[in-house]
């Protein structure tokens, strides 16, 4: 199973990009041993539409164009569920075992994701009740994906 993170906005060169890349590389190395076929990050430009409704719609169209058929979609949302790391690992492991071709994680722009993208998601995931910058959310997500891999592998990184 392939994992894809589709994110509106780009991480500029610097410590945030380096940390995100470190977690992506760690998961790729570990994931191959667990039956995962990689972790891709798709960065999409932020909409320049004048109003929030237009920005959300433009970004939703761009995101939807990158979601493969039969993917398990996870939408990051401040109104989502707070899952613990073990639960996220169970979802990824189950999808892998059920031969789901890929899991796609969606990170919207500053105005959030469209209602339609939220509806098609199997899971709406939040990282607490706080509002996070999109750059930090991407790092948190990549760390949690790596942590899920370590849980599935029985690796001591996760000490719950």
UniProtKB/Swiss-Prot annotation:
EC number(s) given by UniProt: 2.1.1.177
The alphabetized UniProt keywords are: Cytoplasm, Methyltransferase, rRNA processing, S-adenosyl-L-methionine, Transferase
Chain segments annotated as transmembrane? none
Q: Does the keyword Nucleotide-binding apply?
A: no
May I have one GO cellular component term? Answer: cytoplasm
Where on this chain does S-adenosyl-L-methionine bind?
A: 76, 108
Q: What class of enzyme is it?
A: transferase
Query: What Gene Ontology molecular function terms does this protein carry?
Result: rRNA (pseudouridine-N3-)-methyltransferase activity
Cite the InterPro entries for this sequence.
Alpha/beta_knot_MTases (IPR029028), RlmH-like (IPR003742), tRNA_m1G_MTases_N (IPR029026)
Subcellular localization: Cytoplasm
Reaction(s) catalysed (UniProt annotation): pseudouridine(1915) in 23S rRNA + S-adenosyl-L-methionine = N(3)-methylpseudouridine(1915) in 23S rRNA + S-adenosyl-L-homocysteine + H(+)
Pfam families assigned to the protein according to its UniProt record, in alphabetical order: SPOUT_MTase
Gene3D superfamilies in UniProt? 3.40.1280.10
Q: Which family does it belong to?
A: Belongs to the RNA methyltransferase RlmH family.
Q: In UniProt terms, what function does this protein have?
A: Specifically methylates the pseudouridine at position 1915 (m3Psi1915) in 23S rRNA.
Subunit description: Homodimer.
Designated name of the protein: Ribosomal RNA large subunit methyltransferase H
The record lists the lineage as: Bacteria, Pseudomonadati, Pseudomonadota, Alphaproteobacteria, Hyphomicrobiales
């Amino acid at each position: 199973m392939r994992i894809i993170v589709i994110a509106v906005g780009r991480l500029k060169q610097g410590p945030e990009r380096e940390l995100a890349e470190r977690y992506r590389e760690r998961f790729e190395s570990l994931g191959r041993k667990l039956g995962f076929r990689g972790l891709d990050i798709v960065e999409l430009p932020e909409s320049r539409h004048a109003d929030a409704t237009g920005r959300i719609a433009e970004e939703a169209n761009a995101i939807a164009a990158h979601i493969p058929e039969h993917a398990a979609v996870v939408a990051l949302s401040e109104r989502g569920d707070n899952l613990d790391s073990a639960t996220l690992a169970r979802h990824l492991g189950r999808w892998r075992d059920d031969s789901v071709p890929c899991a796609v994680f969606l990170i919207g722009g500053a105005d959030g994701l469209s209602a339609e993208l939220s509806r098609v998601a199997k899971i709406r995931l939040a990282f607490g009740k706080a509002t996070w910058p999109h750059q930090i959310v991407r790092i948190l997500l990549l760390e949690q994906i790596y942590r899920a891999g370590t849980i599935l592998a029985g690796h001591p990184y996760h000490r719950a």
